[in-house]
Amino acid sequence: MKKKTTLSEEDQALFRQLMAGTRKIKQDTIVHRPQRKKISEVPVKRLIQEQADASHYFSDEFQPLLNTEGPVKYVRPDVSHFEAKKLRRGDYSPELFLDLHGLTQLQAKQELGALIAACRREHVFCACVMHGHGKHILKQQTPLWLAQHPHVMAFHQAPKVYGGDAALLVLIEVDEWLPPELP
Protein backbone atom coordinates (compact mmCIF):
# COMPACT_ATOMS: atom_id res chain seq x y z
CA MET A 1 0.00 0.00 0.00
CA LYS A 2 1.40 3.37 -1.03
CA LYS A 3 1.62 6.25 1.42
CA LYS A 4 -0.41 9.23 0.45
CA THR A 5 1.59 12.45 0.36
CA THR A 6 0.36 15.95 -0.03
CA LEU A 7 3.60 17.12 -1.61
CA SER A 8 3.77 17.68 -5.33
CA GLU A 9 6.29 15.82 -7.55
CA GLU A 10 8.48 18.93 -7.72
CA ASP A 11 8.57 19.31 -3.92
CA GLN A 12 9.42 15.64 -3.46
CA ALA A 13 12.26 15.89 -6.00
CA LEU A 14 13.58 19.03 -4.29
CA PHE A 15 13.48 17.27 -0.90
CA ARG A 16 15.42 14.26 -2.25
CA GLN A 17 17.98 16.59 -3.84
CA LEU A 18 18.53 18.49 -0.59
CA MET A 19 18.78 15.30 1.47
CA ALA A 20 21.26 13.64 -0.90
CA GLY A 21 24.51 12.74 0.87
CA THR A 22 23.02 12.67 4.34
CA ARG A 23 23.21 9.59 6.50
CA LYS A 24 21.32 8.40 9.54
CA ILE A 25 22.92 9.33 12.86
CA LYS A 26 23.69 6.43 15.13
CA GLN A 27 22.07 6.96 18.54
CA ASP A 28 24.73 6.37 21.18
CA THR A 29 23.77 8.94 23.78
CA ILE A 30 21.86 8.52 26.99
CA VAL A 31 18.21 9.36 26.78
CA HIS A 32 17.34 11.88 29.45
CA ARG A 33 14.02 11.36 31.12
CA PRO A 34 12.09 14.51 31.90
CA GLN A 35 12.20 15.37 35.58
CA ARG A 36 8.87 14.79 37.20
CA LYS A 37 7.61 16.73 40.12
CA LYS A 38 6.88 14.46 43.05
CA ILE A 39 3.14 14.87 43.21
CA SER A 40 2.59 12.54 46.15
CA GLU A 41 4.63 14.66 48.57
CA VAL A 42 2.44 17.75 48.39
CA PRO A 43 -0.85 16.10 49.40
CA VAL A 44 0.84 14.13 52.20
CA LYS A 45 2.29 17.33 53.64
CA ARG A 46 -1.08 19.04 53.31
CA LEU A 47 -2.88 16.14 55.02
CA ILE A 48 -0.42 16.17 57.92
CA GLN A 49 -0.89 19.93 58.27
CA GLU A 50 -4.68 19.56 58.20
CA GLN A 51 -4.47 16.92 60.94
CA ALA A 52 -2.27 19.15 63.06
CA ASP A 53 -4.54 22.15 62.51
CA ALA A 54 -7.69 20.21 63.34
CA SER A 55 -6.24 18.57 66.46
CA HIS A 56 -5.04 21.99 67.65
CA TYR A 57 -8.58 22.73 68.82
CA PHE A 58 -8.61 19.86 71.32
CA SER A 59 -7.52 20.80 74.84
CA ASP A 60 -7.48 18.63 77.92
CA GLU A 61 -7.67 21.72 80.15
CA PHE A 62 -10.96 23.12 78.82
CA GLN A 63 -14.13 21.48 80.14
CA PRO A 64 -17.22 22.46 78.11
CA LEU A 65 -20.60 22.22 79.83
CA LEU A 66 -22.23 19.05 78.58
CA ASN A 67 -25.39 17.37 79.79
CA THR A 68 -24.26 14.75 82.32
CA GLU A 69 -27.66 13.08 82.59
CA GLY A 70 -28.96 10.79 79.91
CA PRO A 71 -27.20 10.11 76.62
CA VAL A 72 -24.16 12.14 75.62
CA LYS A 73 -25.21 15.00 73.35
CA TYR A 74 -24.13 18.44 72.28
CA VAL A 75 -25.51 21.09 69.94
CA ARG A 76 -23.60 24.22 69.02
CA PRO A 77 -25.53 27.38 70.06
CA ASP A 78 -26.18 28.49 66.46
CA VAL A 79 -27.55 25.07 65.41
CA SER A 80 -31.13 23.85 65.86
CA HIS A 81 -31.68 21.33 68.68
CA PHE A 82 -33.74 19.35 66.19
CA GLU A 83 -30.43 18.21 64.64
CA ALA A 84 -29.55 16.29 67.83
CA LYS A 85 -32.97 14.68 67.72
CA LYS A 86 -32.34 13.59 64.12
CA LEU A 87 -29.00 12.11 65.17
CA ARG A 88 -30.62 10.21 68.04
CA ARG A 89 -33.32 8.77 65.79
CA GLY A 90 -30.76 7.72 63.20
CA ASP A 91 -32.08 10.03 60.46
CA TYR A 92 -28.49 10.75 59.46
CA SER A 93 -26.39 7.80 58.40
CA PRO A 94 -22.64 8.27 58.80
CA GLU A 95 -20.45 8.06 55.72
CA LEU A 96 -17.13 7.89 57.58
CA PHE A 97 -16.31 5.78 60.63
CA LEU A 98 -13.45 6.26 63.08
CA ASP A 99 -12.51 3.54 65.55
CA LEU A 100 -10.49 4.84 68.52
CA HIS A 101 -10.09 1.46 70.24
CA GLY A 102 -6.57 0.93 71.52
CA LEU A 103 -5.33 4.47 70.80
CA THR A 104 -3.67 6.79 73.28
CA GLN A 105 -5.24 10.16 74.01
CA LEU A 106 -2.72 11.93 71.76
CA GLN A 107 -3.34 9.50 68.91
CA ALA A 108 -7.10 9.81 69.41
CA LYS A 109 -6.89 13.62 69.18
CA GLN A 110 -4.88 13.37 65.97
CA GLU A 111 -7.32 10.89 64.47
CA LEU A 112 -10.31 13.05 65.43
CA GLY A 113 -8.63 16.02 63.79
CA ALA A 114 -7.94 13.95 60.68
CA LEU A 115 -11.56 12.76 60.59
CA ILE A 116 -12.95 16.29 60.76
CA ALA A 117 -10.50 17.46 58.07
CA ALA A 118 -11.44 14.50 55.86
CA CYS A 119 -15.15 15.20 56.34
CA ARG A 120 -14.70 18.81 55.29
CA ARG A 121 -12.48 17.89 52.34
CA GLU A 122 -14.85 15.16 51.10
CA HIS A 123 -18.03 17.13 51.95
CA VAL A 124 -19.21 14.45 54.39
CA PHE A 125 -21.90 15.78 56.72
CA CYS A 126 -22.15 12.93 59.26
CA ALA A 127 -19.48 10.67 60.77
CA CYS A 128 -19.41 8.00 63.48
CA VAL A 129 -16.72 7.99 66.17
CA MET A 130 -16.43 4.70 68.05
CA HIS A 131 -14.64 5.33 71.34
CA GLY A 132 -15.60 2.04 72.98
CA HIS A 133 -16.02 1.35 76.67
CA GLY A 134 -12.55 0.35 77.85
CA LYS A 135 -11.31 2.30 80.85
CA HIS A 136 -13.73 5.14 80.04
CA ILE A 137 -10.85 7.55 79.32
CA LEU A 138 -11.63 8.03 75.62
CA LYS A 139 -15.36 7.70 76.33
CA GLN A 140 -15.14 10.71 78.65
CA GLN A 141 -12.64 12.76 76.63
CA THR A 142 -14.05 12.34 73.11
CA PRO A 143 -17.23 14.42 73.71
CA LEU A 144 -15.17 17.11 75.46
CA TRP A 145 -12.78 17.35 72.50
CA LEU A 146 -15.55 17.36 69.91
CA ALA A 147 -17.45 20.15 71.70
CA GLN A 148 -14.35 22.37 71.39
CA HIS A 149 -13.99 22.09 67.62
CA PRO A 150 -15.63 24.94 65.66
CA HIS A 151 -16.63 22.69 62.73
CA VAL A 152 -18.57 20.24 64.91
CA MET A 153 -22.22 21.31 64.75
CA ALA A 154 -23.66 18.59 66.99
CA PHE A 155 -23.11 15.09 68.27
CA HIS A 156 -25.25 12.50 70.00
CA GLN A 157 -24.84 9.02 71.37
CA ALA A 158 -25.17 6.70 68.40
CA PRO A 159 -28.17 4.44 67.87
CA LYS A 160 -27.55 0.73 68.60
CA VAL A 161 -26.98 0.09 64.88
CA TYR A 162 -23.84 2.26 64.94
CA GLY A 163 -22.48 1.26 68.34
CA GLY A 164 -24.90 2.55 70.96
CA ASP A 165 -23.26 4.11 74.01
CA ALA A 166 -19.79 3.13 72.74
CA ALA A 167 -20.04 5.54 69.79
CA LEU A 168 -21.05 9.06 68.82
CA LEU A 169 -22.67 10.36 65.64
CA VAL A 170 -21.13 13.70 64.72
CA LEU A 171 -22.49 16.41 62.42
CA ILE A 172 -19.69 18.28 60.68
CA GLU A 173 -20.06 21.74 59.16
CA VAL A 174 -18.89 21.55 55.57
CA ASP A 175 -18.38 24.34 53.08
CA GLU A 176 -21.11 24.60 50.50
CA TRP A 177 -20.09 22.49 47.53
CA LEU A 178 -20.50 24.05 44.13
CA PRO A 179 -20.08 22.01 40.95
CA PRO A 180 -17.29 23.20 38.65
CA GLU A 181 -18.39 25.66 36.01
CA LEU A 182 -18.56 24.35 32.49
CA PRO A 183 -16.81 26.33 29.73
UniProtKB/Swiss-Prot annotation:
InterPro entries documented for this protein: Smr_dom (IPR002625), Smr_dom_sf (IPR036063), SmrB-like (IPR022990)
Biological processes per GO annotation: rescue of stalled ribosome
Smr domain: residues covered: 98-173
Gene3D superfamilies recorded: 3.30.1370.110
Pfam families xrefs: Smr
Top-level class of the enzyme under EC nomenclature: hydrolase
One Gene Ontology molecular-function label: RNA endonuclease activity
Record keywords: Endonuclease, Hydrolase, Nuclease, RNA-binding, rRNA-binding
EC number: 3.1.-.-
Similarity comment: family membership: Belongs to the SmrB family.
Quaternary structure note: Associates with collided ribosomes, but not with correctly translating polysomes.
Role: Acts as a ribosome collision sensor. Detects stalled/collided disomes (pairs of ribosomes where the leading ribosome is stalled and a second ribosome has collided with it) and endonucleolytically cleaves mRNA at the 5' boundary of the stalled ribosome. Stalled/collided disomes form a new interface (primarily via the 30S subunits) that binds SmrB. Cleaved mRNA becomes available for tmRNA ligation, leading to ribosomal subunit dissociation and rescue of stalled ribosomes.
NCBIfam families: PRK04946.1 (NF003432)
UniProt cross-references to HAMAP family, sorted A to Z: SmrB
Protein name according to UniProt: Ribosome rescue factor SmrB
